[in-house]
């Protein structure tokens, strides 16, 4: 599988993100997922606008890569060669050698993009054909659900609660 990391398209096992990246130490990053059906990006402009909105609301500088995002996704699409795939785009505030809530002013955002085949998901039957089993739960996360942050512990806890039935997805609501 091929991924994009900070200006390079490379094989996934060659991609290395620093353990000092603020996405690891603080969950300090945002993400967006853009699906592609029959090799066509779905609602690209709307997803890009939401990604930029999350970046602006978290004061993470908008990386120049976003100007070429469509071309980057097309190249990944070709290299990974899935007809239907989803692109996960994660942008963190970047690497900081000294752990501190205050980010250094010269921190450069880390841009990471990967994709996966929408036809096969080892965690559930094909949702494109069979549908999903879901559960509704109160949203107990922080109050800024308008920002797609990489800190998804609330979602993870909902999926792993052993006292509840197994589902494909949990829909959180306020």
Locations of regions flagged by a protein language model:
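Ordered, amphipathic secondary-structure segments that act as subunit-interaction surfaces
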Residues: 78-91, 98
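Helix-start/capping segments and mature chain N-termini
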Residues: 1-75, 97, 101-174
């Amino acid at each position: 599988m091929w991924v994009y990391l900070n200006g390079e398209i490379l094989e996934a096992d060659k991609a290395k993100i620093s353990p000092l990246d603020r996405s690891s130490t603080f969950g300090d990053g945002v993400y967006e997922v853009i699906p592609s059906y029959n090799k066509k990006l779905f609602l690209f402009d709307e997803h890009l606008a939401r990604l930029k909105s999350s970046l602006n609301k978290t004061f993470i500088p908008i990386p120049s890569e976003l100007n070429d995002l469509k071309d980057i996704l097309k190249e990944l699409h070709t290299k990974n060669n899935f007809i239907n795939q989803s692109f996960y785009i994660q942008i963190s505030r970047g690497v900081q050698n000294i752990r501190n809530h205050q980010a250094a002013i010269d921190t450069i955002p880390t841009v990471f993009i990967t994709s996966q085949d929408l036809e096969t998901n080892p965690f559930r039957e094909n949702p494109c054909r069979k549908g999903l089993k879901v559960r509704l739960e109160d949203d107990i996360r922080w109050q800024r659900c308008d920002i797609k942050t990489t800190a998804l512990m609330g979602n993870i806890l909902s999926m792993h609660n052993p006292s509840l039935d197994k589902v494909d997805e949990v829909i959180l609501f306020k």
